[in-house]
From Swiss-Prot:
CDD domains the UniProt entry points to: S24_LexA-like (cd06529)
Lineage top rank: taxon: Bacteria
Subunit composition and interactions: Homodimer.
Family label: Belongs to the peptidase S24 family.
Protein known as: LexA repressor
Signal peptide (from-to): none
Key words, A-Z: Autocatalytic cleavage, DNA damage, DNA repair, DNA replication, DNA-binding, Hydrolase, Repressor, SOS response, Transcription, Transcription regulation
InterPro entries with a match to the protein in the record: LexA, LexA-like, LexA/Signal_pep-like_sf, LexA_DNA-bd_dom, LexA_repressor, Peptidase_S24_LexA, Peptidase_S24_S26A/B/C, WH-like_DNA-bd_sf
Protein purpose: Represses a number of genes involved in the response to DNA damage (SOS response), including recA and lexA. In the presence of single-stranded DNA, RecA interacts with LexA causing an autocatalytic cleavage which disrupts the DNA-binding part of LexA, leading to derepression of the SOS regulon and eventually DNA repair.
SUPFAM superfamilies, alphabetized: LexA/Signal peptidase, Winged helix' DNA-binding domain
Protein source organism: Geotalea uraniireducens (strain Rf4)
Transmembrane segments: none
Gene: lexA
GO molecular function annotations of the record: DNA binding; serine-type endopeptidase activity
The keyword Transcription regulation appears for this protein: yes
Length: 201
């Protein structure tokens, strides 16, 4: 089989998760609504690609006519709120929904999504509105992109530990880093960002 693009993997994972939880495949509108695709034409293009590459077949004339070819292991990951890629903002931890992804893309247990707001990580390819897949962990290596909490406020930045301070570095040349000295406050690492998911249509 041909290799899938990340977007095609997301469509296939949602179909698999919907089949597992409901017992029948989703409609075009349900796929579009889940992935943020306006209209059915964009969804049909993804399904055409999946069928051409041998991952699905479709029964003509049926709104739920998608049939998986082989097994796809999908899992639904909770979206637990918004994290600002910019200035600090209060952490939001109420589950707002779920997003289905290929289980092979999930590295670790208890992973969750945070929706990115702001453009301080734009030069790392992380845009406002993206879903950041976060693996919970309390430590980070220099250069990791993390979700960090400072005094109950959360931010998404690149992490650096330097002598007596921690630097949370934006990936936007127009913005300054957040510097926290050891005696000025505590930085808690919520988790490491292991993937970014985006609606392309």
């Amino acid at each position: 089989m041909e290799k899938l693009t990340p977007r095609q993997q997301m469509v296939l994972a949602f179909i698999s998760a919907h089949l597992e939880s409901h017992g029948y495949p989703p409609t075009l509108r349900e796929i579009g609504g889940h992935l943020g695709i306006n209209g059915t034409l964009g969804v049909m293009k993804h399904l055409d690609a999946l069928e051409r590459k041998g991952f699905i077949t479709r029964n003509a004339g049926s709104s739920r006519g998608i049939v998986l070819v082989g097994a796809v292991a999908a899992t639904s990951i909770p979206i637990v709120g918004v994290v600002r890629a910019g200035a600090l903002q209060p952490a939001i931890e109420d589950i707002e929904g779920y997003f289905a992804v290929d289980r092979a893309l999930v590295k670790g247990a208890d992973c969750f999504f945070l929706r990115v707001k702001g453009d301080s990580m734009i030069e790392a390819g992380i845009r406002s509105g993206d879903l950041a897949l976060v693996r919970p962990q309390a430590t980070a290596d220099n250069g990791d992109i993390v979700v960090a909490r400072i005094n109950d406020e959360a931010t998404l930045k690149r992490f650096f530990r330097e002598k007596d301070r921690i630097r949370l570095q934006p990936e936007n040349s127009a913005m300054e880093p957040i510097i926290v000295k050891a005696k000025a406050g505590e930085v808690n690492i919520i988790g490491k960002v292991t993937g970014i998911f985006r609606s392309l249509e």
